[in-house]
Amino acid sequence: MDGTLVDSEKLWDVSMNALCARLGGVLSPEAREATVGGSSESVMRAVYAELGLEPEPAAMAESADWLHDYTGELFEAGLPWLPGAQELLEKLVTAGVPLALVTNTRRDLTERALNSIGRHYFSVTVCGDEVVHAKPAPDPYLRAAELLGLDASQCLAIEDSVTGTAAAEAAGAPVVVVPNDVDVPGGPHRKHVSSLSELDVDDLRGIFASLSGERDEQPA
């Protein structure tokens, strides 16, 4: 969701910097980049390590709650779509393609985002705090595929981050990579595109067939 469908990473920049100021420090660009696509827990660990703070669980939980409340207020002011994202979702829905939103964002904040962009696009939604292990573990994608009644290998993931791409691949799904703020390395089961505006339903079907074929050709 963040950085794939909506241009929310800039809002996360604002809230992350505000949190660090509240904690008495400054977040370096390198540390911020390392948090992109991360779970709430991993982000807090990175922030506390960056600021040299003791990673006390209660303090990190309070910081996470503050961060998500602040970010939610920014989300509710309006989330800008990334180029081509809304149009592609509408085409997929019209074509009858079931869609799952798979995000490391917590459920409470995801609901605030869905209030802004519309939840009607998605057949199912899976959030980072609803699985045992968030991305880069495969759990979120495996859960989404299960809810859709599919195997993950029957699904095509669209991701913008190293973390999300790793999660999709670990689940067995080929990936369309649309890099946003962080470069994502290439791979045999990844198709890089510069923007979702380049894609329509037939393009996605062709990419899925191509990447799935490459996976089938790999030695056991």
PLM ranges: what are they?
Residues 1-33:
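Active-site neighborhood of HAD-like aspartate-dependent phosphohydrolases
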Residues 4, 103-105:
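Conserved phosphate-coupling serine/threonine residues in phosphotransfer and NTP-handling enzymes
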Residues 11, 35-39, 66, 80-84, ...:
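Short beta->alpha linker loops
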Residues 13, 17, 37-45, 64, ...:
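An amphipathic alpha-helix signature
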Residues 17-20, 41-55, 113, 145:
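Helix-loop "lid/cap" segments that line or gate small-molecule binding pockets
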Residues 22-25, 51-55, 95, 117-121, ...:
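Short helix-capping segments at alpha-helix termini
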Residues 90-93, 106-220:
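Asp-based, Mg2+/Mn2+-dependent phosphohydrolase catalytic module
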